[in-house]
């Protein structure tokens, strides 16, 4: 184990979070595609700890199930009653056998902006300074309401954490505050937790009392200052949740732009932590990129588009579109106002145009579905053209069925393809056709009734109407006169 690699990280995630006013446990609320506790776990994993323990309590079945999904290797400890942060850490250590040799880092499960880099700095400072405990602190513009860090003027060691209500005027002038994140000597921590008292207004075991116990025993208490005070912000309500989402989104967009991505309007662009970009990708205003979405080199998305778990190939263009679990080939064109549902796969240079919806459809290279169509449960070959207002009728009321259209086909406007049906390579279909039988390669399919004109119908059925009058005037015009 390296000098700064902790023996354990303990994440405190047992609180109810009543100020969120939500049926969802606080630590499971999402920002930028990851739960609050998920962000904390990701930062903690950067330390490569020997053990990672999450202390759960409120809604523990739901939280534990989520943890198993996002990080199966994590261990959980139960704090059945909310008896304070010191008690929660004690439950975490009991999961590890009670005493841990090495450094134990304690973090809060509702601090999604905390970075792995800051935690590494904390662990490194703790080891280098030989501290019994190291407090992660931050200097904030306004420290009102926070516990102040009081240091020894000569050594810089932390002598006390004074709560705002108990602070003197000189102490209230201090802008360095306690984050609630600590690095401890594991053996000293276990011993000190056994000495924490509950004779306070809340009747709880406070983790901060450990600092005083260790200092009074002659051990050094130090501090590591976070470079960005916003990293230590905890989430207690929806306002703070929104602010954290904005900060993290700005961080993600800045990273993308510095890597060669053009974001036209960062204020209206939202991305998840798992989104990736190729160089020279362009993102237009009003765009949301979610989940594992990938934009290839030179791909262009937006404005007003939402993509989730979607791959966009190099040079592809997506405009005013919603796409989920879709795969868009290189130099393909989508939109405006298209909807790519799960299972959509577009080949290179394919086109899905205005007001087109696709689902579980494979559309080949160079094929075009330009207008007002639904393509579901279908395979279309290369360089075919699907006429406007076409519908792939895939559902018979009980089961879904598949339609296959070959390569180099031309289908007329207002076609219905009633699955299961196959249109062979190079075949054409006439406008207005309802295709219910297979069309052989190279054939023209015409599946519509003959047109029948009933002369004088309007005059008989709608006498005196505007249509009847217009028809009467037209009938009096000499042939050939406009």
UniProtKB/Swiss-Prot annotation:
Major site of localization recorded for this protein: cytoplasm
EC number of this enzyme: 2.7.7.23, 2.3.1.157
Catalysed reactions listed for this entry: alpha-D-glucosamine 1-phosphate + acetyl-CoA = N-acetyl-alpha-D-glucosamine 1-phosphate + CoA + H(+); N-acetyl-alpha-D-glucosamine 1-phosphate + UTP + H(+) = UDP-N-acetyl-alpha-D-glucosamine + diphosphate
Alphabetical list of InterPro entries matching this protein: Bifunctional_GlmU, GlmU-like, GlmU_C_LbH, MobA-like_NTP_Trfase, Nucleotide-diphossugar_trans, Trimer_LpxA-like_sf
Active site: 371 (proton acceptor)
Subunit structure: Homotrimer.
The protein's name in its UniProt record: Bifunctional protein GlmU
Lineage: Bacteria, Bacillati, Actinomycetota, Actinomycetes, Kitasatosporales
């Amino acid at each position: 184990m390296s000098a700064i690699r902790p023996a354990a990280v303990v994440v405190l995630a047992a609180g109810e979070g009543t100020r969120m006013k939500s049926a969802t446990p606080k630590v499971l609320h999402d920002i930028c595609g990851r739960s609050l506790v998920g962000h904390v776990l990701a930062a903690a994993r950067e330390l490569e700890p020997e053990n990672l323990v999450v202390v759960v309590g409120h809604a523990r079945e739901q939280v534990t199930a989520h943890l198993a999904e996002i990080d199966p290797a994590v261990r959980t400890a139960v704090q059945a009653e909310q008896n304070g942060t010191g008690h929660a850490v004690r439950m975490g250590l009991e999961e590890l056998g009670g005493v841990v040799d090495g450094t134990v880092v304690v973090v809060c499960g509702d601090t999604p902006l905390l970075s792995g880099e800051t935690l590494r700095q904390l662990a490194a400072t703790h080891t280098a300074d030989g501290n019994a405990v190291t407090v992660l602190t931050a200097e904030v513009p306004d420290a009102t309401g926070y516990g102040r860090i009081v240091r020894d003027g000569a050594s810089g060691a932390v002598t006390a954490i004074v709560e705002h209500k108990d602070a003197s005027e000189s102490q209230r002038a201090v802008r360095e505050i306690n984050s609630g994140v600590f690095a401890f000597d594991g053996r000293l921590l276990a011993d000190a937790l056994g000495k924490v008292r509950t004779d306070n207004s809340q009747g709880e075991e406070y983790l901060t009392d450990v600092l005083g116990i260790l200092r009074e025993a002659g051990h050094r208490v130090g501090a590591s200052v976070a470079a960005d005070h916003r990293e230590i912000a905890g989430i207690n309500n929806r306002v703070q949740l929104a602010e954290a989402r904005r900060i993290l989104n700005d961080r993600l967009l800045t990273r993308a732009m510095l890597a060669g991505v053009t974001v036209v309007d960062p204020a209206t662009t939202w991305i998840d932590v798992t989104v990736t970009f190729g160089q020279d990708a362009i993102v237009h205003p009003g765009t949301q990129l979610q989940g594992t979405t990938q934009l290839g080199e030179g791909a262009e998305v937006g404005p007003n588009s939402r993509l989730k778990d979607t791959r966009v190939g190099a040079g592809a263009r997506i405009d005013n579109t919603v796409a989920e679990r879709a795969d868009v080939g290189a130099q393909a064109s989508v939109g405006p106002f298209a909807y790519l549902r799960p299972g959509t796969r577009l080949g290179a240079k394919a086109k899905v145009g205005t007001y087109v919806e696709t689902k579980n459809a494979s559309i080949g290279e160079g094929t075009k579905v330009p207008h007002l169509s639904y393509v579901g449960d279908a395979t279309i070959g290369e360089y075919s053209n699907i006429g406007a207002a076409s519908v792939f009728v895939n559902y018979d009321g009980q089961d879904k069925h598949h339609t296959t259209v070959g390569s180099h086909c031309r289908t007329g406007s207002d076609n219905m393809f009633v699955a299961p049906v196959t249109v062979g390579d190079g075949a054409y279909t006439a406008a207005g056709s309802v295709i219910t039988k297979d069309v052989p390669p190279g054939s023209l399919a015409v599946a519509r009734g003959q047109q029948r004109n009933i002369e004088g119908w309007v005059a008989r059925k709608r006498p005196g109407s505007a249509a009847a009058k217009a028809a009467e005037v037209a009938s009096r015009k000499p042939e050939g006169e406009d």
